[in-house]
Design a protein with these regions (language model features):
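Conserved short beta-strand elements that form part of the metal-binding/catalytic scaffold
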Residues: 3-17, 52-87, 93, 132, ...
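Short glycine-enriched loop/turn motifs at secondary-structure junctions
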Residues: 24-27, 82-86, 124
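Residue-level "edge-of-site" marker
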Residues: 58-59, 119, 150
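Amphipathic alpha-helical segments
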Residues: 36-52
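Vicinal oxygen chelate
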Residues: 35-39, 90-139, 147, 167-180
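N-terminal beta-strand motif that seeds the catalytic metal site of vicinal oxygen chelate
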Residues: 2-39, 89, 148-180
């Protein structure tokens, strides 16, 4: 997989364009998510999702894949806040066939990894993908995009004015409920 990562991401650096901002960061470094149990979640992250995990603190561990960006998973027990599918983490795979294979594996291993929901595979917003809700009510999108989506999104630039309405009522994802 290292080869595929290096083929897809030839240049992983995006120079900041923040000359006029108050904060002048050099990188978006991390995000956070909650989990019931680090031990149970780590099994899912490593064995199913293929993420690298390091427990760097008693209540937390970091996960990453492919880039030097990480997610901090924090064990909060029963205080977990279930997420909506619009709050999800995306994992890119090498082909549509790989999306289909992983979708079948997700269904086959729902009980083993305590996967709560596996949604159908769809072609949407330019990617072939499906969503799954993990044991901690976090959502993951397994997707294939022919190219590197991050580069294309930013290279294409704004397609709509900030004065255009968001048309929130058309977001069918708002109707997808967590299993909580």
């Amino acid at each position: 997989m290292t080869t595929l990562t290096r083929e897809k991401i030839v240049d992983g650096i995006a120079d900041p364009t923040n000359e006029k901002s108050i904060v002048k960061p050099y990188v978006l470094s991390h995000g956070t998510m909650e989990c019931y149990s680090l031990k149970e979640s780590r099994k899912f992250y490593e064995e199913f999702l293929g993420l690298e995990c390091v427990r760097h603190a008693k209540p937390a561990m970091v996960v990453r894949c492919g880039l030097k960006f990480h997610i901090v998973a924090v064990e909060v027990g029963g205080a977990v806040h279930p997420q909506n599918v619009l709050n999800h983490w995306g994992l890119d795979v090498g082909s549509k066939e790989e999306v289909d294979r992983v979708h079948k594996e997700a269904i086959a291993h729902k009980e083993k990894y305590k996967i709560r929901q596996v949604l159908p595979v769809v072609m949407q917003h330019g990617v072939y993908s499906f969503y799954l809700e993990d044991l901690d009510h976090n959502w993951w999108e397994i997707q294939h995009y022919p190219g590197f989506q991050n580069e294309d999104l930013f290279d294409f630039g704004d397609r709509f004015s900030m004065d255009d309405g968001a048309e929130v009522g058309e977001l069918k994802e708002l109707n997808i409920k967590s299993t909580a």
